[in-house]
């Protein structure tokens, strides 16, 4: 079983979008904290994750905790945007080939969700 989490950290730390493309399954499902419906497929997931990378890396984004069990990982992060301390988690699942099949993002507090919604909206326009 291949674990893509170390490669995911490379994507985040280096903004390595080529590696991001390589570790996403073609049928990956992305769950945004600000969009009700799941986003299905590699292309739309790439758009969301690349936009998030630009928004989050402009701040002091940092992972603090990581729990891995079988083919699932929970990564807790913090960042500060517009003087608002934000924390959240990325829940990541992958298949036997080590390709990410599901990516869920949870963020708190509500003020942080609203800020990220606005900034992500600007990036995705």
Regions picked out by a protein language model, each given a short descriptive name:
Residues 19-21, 28, 41, 45, ...:
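Hydrophobic pocket/interface hotspot
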Residues 50-125:
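A beta-strand edge to alpha-helix "cap/lid" segment located at domain peripheries
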Residues 1-2, 28, 82-83:
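Short hydrophobic/aromatic segments of transmembrane alpha-helices and their interfaces
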Residues 18, 25-70:
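A solvent-exposed, acidic/Ser-Thr-rich amphipathic alpha-helical stretch
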Residues 2-23:
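Short acidic-aromatic low-complexity motifs
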């Amino acid at each position: 079983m291949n674990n893509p989490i170390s490669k995911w950290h490379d994507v985040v730390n280096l903004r390595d979008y080529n590696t991001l493309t390589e570790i996403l399954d073609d049928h990956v499902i992305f769950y945004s904290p600000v969009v009700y419906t799941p986003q299905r497929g590699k292309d739309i997931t790439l758009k969301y994750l690349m936009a998030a990378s630009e928004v989050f890396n402009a701040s002091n984004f940092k992972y603090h905790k990581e729990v891995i069990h079988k083919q699932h990982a929970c990564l807790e992060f913090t960042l500060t945007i517009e003087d608002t301390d934000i924390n959240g988690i990325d829940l990541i699942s992958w298949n036997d080939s080590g390709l990410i099949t599901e990516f869920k993002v949870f963020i708190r507090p509500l003020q942080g969700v609203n800020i990220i919604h606005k900034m992500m909206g600007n990036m995705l326009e």
